């Protein structure tokens, strides 16, 4: 088992610091013959594949599902839902996304709770082009940045080359304050959901009329990073494990309303919360159909510091599963719960989710709660 210093990973793998890389990214970012991007380390002559990132609207994804159904290739299936609960600190790896990604089975997809620019910026003022943003993801233990840093080379291209085009200046390839991925950028929803640097920041100037409809929902976009190599796993102290072997996974990037930030008009708080949760989970299941995913790992989007009600998240998971899983290739849907004993205050998240799934029509035979007390064997 080999380990990577979390403070120096960018330079160790790319050959230069992030700030140096940004000044000459055209020398380090290459397109491979399969169309995917890769990072070229000029010091070691190593090429690190980064997979392929794209943004798709829910409407476009639904069209793909309709095509699948029409050609008879969709199949009925009842995937097993596994809710994972750790009962001790030692069992952390069972619910830590970096570890889970590094042990992923083939055809796995991981949902990432991100922001509306597919970047785990901690604030509206964080400068992605400042020369440290990607590097610092490896130092953040929250699960969104942990998921991204685990597939660190893909993270580099998603932040610094989502607009890759060899025919334009390489300084225009990356995300910065003036140009970003916009999951809520469609004209029909933009005025209802004002975004600054990926963060929803309501000002009170939004339209007083907002009624959730299918057209608006289908305008929401999600980010899909296909064939992302998982270079790193669990963290210990200042180090992170180097994956061996190195799984190839898909990641889907979604976001939720932050109920601890400036809020929408009070009459819209619940409807906009539910609208974005529905988009997050339906979008994820649709991406899984697109990619013929067999093993899907979900997270409680908006359930941490964003303060979304656990009941709303559980309901959105249930409805998305019931609506779309029958069209998928899914064998398992795993939902790790990060907090010890799955508790958030006085609420047992696992039990709320289990009961919501059952009430939503999912048979108890298809739902399992896995309780973990000890670390995985390969972490002992």
Regions found by a protein language model. Name each.
Residues 1-296, 300-380:
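Macrodomain-like recognition of ADP-ribose-binding/processing modules
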């Amino acid at each position: 088992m080999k380990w990577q210093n979390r403070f120096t990973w960018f330079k160790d793998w790319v050959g230069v610091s992030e700030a140096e890389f940004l000044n000459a990214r055209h020398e380090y970012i290459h397109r491979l013959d399969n169309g995917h991007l890769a990072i070229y380390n000029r010091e070691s002559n190593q090429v690190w594949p980064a997979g392929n990132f794209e943004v798709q609207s829910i409407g476009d994804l639904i069209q793909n599902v309709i095509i699948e159904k029409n050609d008879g290739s969709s199949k009925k299936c009842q995937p097993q839902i596994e809710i994972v609960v750790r009962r001790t600190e030692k069992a952390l790896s069972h619910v830590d996304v970096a570890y889970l990604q590094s042990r992923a089975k083939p055809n796995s997809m991981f949902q990432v709770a991100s922001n509306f620019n597919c970047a785990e910026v901690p604030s509206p003022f964080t400068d992605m082009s400042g020369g440290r943003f990607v590097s610092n993801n490896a130092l953040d233990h929250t699960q969104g940045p942990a998921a991204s840093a685990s597939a660190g080379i893909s993270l580099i291209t998603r932040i610094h080359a989502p607009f890759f085009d060899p025919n334009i200046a390489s300084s225009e390839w990356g995300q910065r304050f003036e140009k970003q991925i916009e999951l809520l950028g469609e004209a029909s929803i933009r005025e209802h959901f004002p975004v600054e640097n990926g963060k929803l920041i309501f000002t009170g100037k939004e339209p007083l009329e907002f009624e959730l409809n299918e057209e608006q929902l289908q305008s929401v976009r999600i980010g899909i990073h296909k064939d992302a190599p998982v270079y790193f796993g669990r963290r210990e102290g200042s180090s992170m494990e180097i994956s061996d072997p190195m799984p190839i996974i898909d990641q889907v990037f979604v976001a939720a309303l932050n109920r601890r930030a400036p809020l929408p008009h009070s009459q819209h708080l619940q409807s906009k919360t539910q609208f974005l949760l529905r988009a997050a989970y339906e979008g994820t299941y649709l991406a899984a159909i697109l990619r013929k995913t067999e093993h899907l790992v979900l997270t409680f989007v908006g359930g941490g510091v964003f303060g979304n009600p656990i009941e709303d998240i559980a309901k959105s998971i249930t409805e998305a599963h019931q609506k779309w899983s029958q069209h998928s290739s899914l064998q398992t849907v795993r939902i790790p719960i990060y907090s010890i004993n799955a508790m958030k205050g006085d609420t047992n998240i696992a039990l709320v989710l289990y009961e919501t799934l059952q009430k939503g029509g999912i048979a108890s035979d298809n739902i399992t709660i896995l309780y973990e007390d000890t670390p995985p064997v390969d972490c002992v």
